[in-house]
Design a protein with these regions (language model features):
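Bacterial Sec-dependent N-terminal signal peptides
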Residues: 1-48
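Blade-loop segments of beta-propeller domains
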Residues: 54-55, 93-130, 150-162, 212-222, ...
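Structural signature of eukaryotic scaffold interfaces centered on beta-propeller domains
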Residues: 59-67, 111-116, 164-176, 223-230, ...
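Short beta-strand elements that form the blades of beta-propeller/WD-repeat-like
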Residues: 63, 67-77, 117-129, 175-188, ...
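Beta-propeller blade signature
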Residues: 86-88, 134-143, 193-204, 249-266, ...
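Long, internal scaffold/assembly segments composed of regular secondary structure
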Residues: 230-234, 248-367
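Conserved blade-ending motifs and adjacent loop-strand segments that build the rim/top face
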Residues: 272-282, 327-345, 408-428, 466-469, ...
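Loop/turn-rich, solvent-exposed surfaces of beta-rich toroidal or solenoidal domains
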Residues: 352-356, 361-372, 376-378, 393, ...
């Protein structure tokens, strides 16, 4: 079975939107892919690529690890060319490279995915004459040659050039199909449909549908999508809260529903997945190996941005009935571990990852994020100055069985804040394998030793200094946590980049660091 690998590993602020593709395109374990610079970084790092230093023409770097033992690195450059480099995952030695030029002028790369050694790229182009956004796709061999020609695959009429196209792409788990559609920042009207076009790997269109959802008292704004192996599509309402630059966050409201559309029988089915007396804060959904849909996330008892527990809903395959629907509150002991005595809920936690294991177990990973303000007054002028701090703190993990019960819950202490909301070195990277789970992040060097003392439960604060370490936290399948220092960031004056998360074969963990227009990949011993 061919498996597509999609990745958005960026040196700076993300331009593309690949994160939603990861959960639908992988059937294997996630791995951390990061950037680094020297073979002398740490005894835990051994093999490194040759890398790039101070290349001013380098815009972004994206990478992917494949089943056939290759690490694919794609460099986007200012001249519009893409450099495709291939390395052996075992030794990280270069085994090939090619240069890909855009097939036409004014194309904007929106998405790409890799199946075996064929790279499929999806572009958008603003058509000023026709007042529309045109979408094209092209396939390239590993030698950089264009397969066939540039294909026109979608379009959307516009009232003026949009700030961004809103083009989205979802792959089936077996990577034999992908669907294109537009999901813009502006909420849809009741009468507005969603225009889907589904293709196979050869860019042959399988079906097309302008899907209009059933009328409802409240308009269901759909922002979650899944494509199953048969080519049918699932949709789910609700836009999850994001870690925004604002210091105020409003939880979701309104009707919460999921839909199933079979393009071959034209059947549209609706599922009500809301909680009657509770507030759904954030959810994700994914397909398991049986093609069942797993919906899981956080809920609140008080209709504020405070998490009270987890919810789990399982839909039978191919638009079947609801197999399981339940919610589970956090235990008092876990809330005390996270927040201390006297608390009943967890504040400011955002759902980042939903992992569905082969055993049917579901793992939810969320991070505590909030914006704080500090106001100071200049004693001479009386002028007030406001400092905003963007805080990335503890991470929590919950493992749920198929009955929605918590098998284990883990707190991973972490404290970070930055004054720059566009700094890519904050937060964390998550990976899953058959052996368990791993979280990697930049950390103060005193944290590991400090947390080894059972009397101290707070990590030391890291604020962006390169006099720091990269911490690796491992969680076993039974919920046992261990914390080690992966490498000392001081040696090369570089920082771990958490945006660089990808999928690949179990057993190949590749790490690294980035700084401006420089990068390098390394893997552990």
């Amino acid at each position: 079975m061919a498996t597509a690998w999609i990745f958005s590993a960026l040196l700076r602020v993300p331009k593309y939107h690949f994160n939603h593709l990861l959960s639908t395109a992988v059937s294997w374990a996630l791995l951390c892919l990061c950037l680094c610079f020297s073979e002398t970084l740490s005894s835990q790092l051994r093999y490194c690529t040759s890398g790039v230093k101070n290349d001013r023409s380098l815009e972004r770097v994206q990478a992917v690890a494949s089943k056939n033992g290759k690490l694919h690195v794609i460099e986007e450059r200012q001249d519009g060319e893409l450099h495709w480099l291939r390395y052996s995952l075992d030794s990280l030695k270069e085994i090939g490279n090619s240069t890909i030029s855009f097939p036409a002028n004014d194309l904007v790369l929106e998405h790409f995915f890799l199946v075996n050694d064929t790279l499929t790229m999806v572009y958008s182009q603003w058509n000023k004459t026709a007042e529309r956004t045109d979408v094209f796709a092209a396939c390239f061999t590993e030698f950089g040659s264009l397969v066939d020609s540039l294909h026109s695959v979608h379009m959307r009429p516009e009232n003026g050039k949009p700030r961004r196209s809103g083009l989205q792409c979802e792959l089936s788990p077996d990577s034999t199909k992908f669907v294109l559609f537009f999901d813009g920042e502006v909420e849809r009207k009741q009468s507005e449909g969603i225009h889907f076009r589904c293709f196979n790997r050869s860019l042959k269109q399988l079906w097309e549908k302008e899907l209009r959802l059933p009328p409802a008292v409240e308009i269901a704004q759909v922002h979650h999508y899944l494509l199953d192996n048969s080519g049918a599509i699932y949709l789910m309402s609700g836009r999850n809260p994001i870690k925004s630059f604002s210091d105020w966050q409003r939880p979701q409201g309104g009707q919460y529903v999921a839909y199933y559309f079979d393009p071959y029988t034209k059947r549209l089915k609706q599922y009500d997945i809301g909680l009657k007396d509770k507030q759904v804060l954030s959810t994700e959904f994914a397909l398991n190996d049986k093609q069942e849909v797993v919906i899981a996330g956080y809920y609140s008892n008080n209709f504020k941005f405070r998490v009270s527990g987890t919810l789990l809903i399982i839909l039978n395959a191919h638009g079947g009935s609801i197999k399981k629907a339940a919610y589970t509150p956090f235990s008092e002991a876990f809330i005390t571990t996270m927040e201390g005595d006297g608390k009943e809920t967890l504040e400011d936690f955002y759902l980042d990852h939903l992992h569905v294991g082969d055993s049917g177990r579901v793992v939810l990973v969320g991070e505590q994020y909030y914006v704080s303000r500090f106001v100071s007054t200049d004693p001479t002028t009386g002028r007030q100055m406001v400092e905003y701090r963007y805080n990335f703190d503890d991470v929590m993990m919950h493992c749920l069985d198929t009955a929605a019960e918590h098998l284990w819950s883990v707190r991973i202490p972490k404290r970070q804040f930055t004054n720059s909301p566009t700094d890519v070195h904050f937060s964390y990277a998550f990976a899953a394998s058959n052996e368990g789970f791993a979280l990697t992040f930049n950390d103060d060097e005193a944290s590991t030793e400090r947390l080894a003392n059972d009397d101290d439960t707070q990590a030391s604060l890291w604020t962006g200094s390169k006099n720091s370490v990269t911490t690796l936290c491992r969680v076993t399948n039974t919920g046992q946590l261990s914390r080690t220092t992966l490498t000392d960031n001081t040696t090369e004056r570089l920082l771990f980049n958490p945006l660089m998360t990808t999928s690949g074969p179990v057993g190949h963990s590749v790490f690294g660091f980035s700084d401006s227009r420089s990068y390098k990949f390394c893997r552990r011993r």
